[in-house]
């Protein structure tokens, strides 16, 4: 059920239990904010081996997370659409399997907290965290909360909202996690930005 990735120097350490689980993925829109949060945890002194991602087998997390040096566990299945179809029935069975695997994983690892980002893998982990009494934070990146996040937000200790007025319980306005290099680029002057991009200073773009 998964793949793991660590830096070379961390690979020599004994296996550690994760302190945090970041659950979600299936799309880059769900995954990238989680990677930003994970990098910030490392910056604050946590080892990469203690920040565990849980995602979907079919999502970009299967390659992107190990490339960034974090462990990842991949759950089977796919998201459920709104219509009642044979594919949705199969997806429902896949979600049940994923929930069982997530429950066993969280029961074994007992992380301090779970961050749910959206997508079916986050539903499986969020429901398991609620059953086990593990603190759950739901983070939504949209002005209108996604269906997965709306479903599990009722179990959350708190919800991190990117915009004011998002209809989630116990919501705290945090904005979206942003990579440091993007923040740095936003502070450049027009002249500096043109120079970085190799654009002439005297032409209209």
Model-derived regions: residue spans:
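N-terminal subdomain of nucleotide-sugar transferases
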Residues: 1-55
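Active-site-proximal region of nucleotide-activated glycan assembly enzymes
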Residues: 52, 60, 130-191
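Conserved nucleotide-sugar phosphate-binding/catalytic loop shared by glycosyltransferases and other
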Residues: 17-23, 47-97, 174-179
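An aromatic- and histidine-rich active-site surface loop
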Residues: 59-63, 113-132
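Conserved donor-binding/catalytic core segment of Leloir-type glycosyltransferases
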Residues: 200-205
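A short helix/loop element that forms part of the nucleotide-sugar donor recognition site in Leloir-type
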Residues: 87-89, 184-199
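Glycine-rich, highly charged phosphate/nucleotide-binding loops
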Residues: 90-105, 192
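Short N-terminal targeting/anchoring amphipathic segment
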Residues: 102-121, 137-139
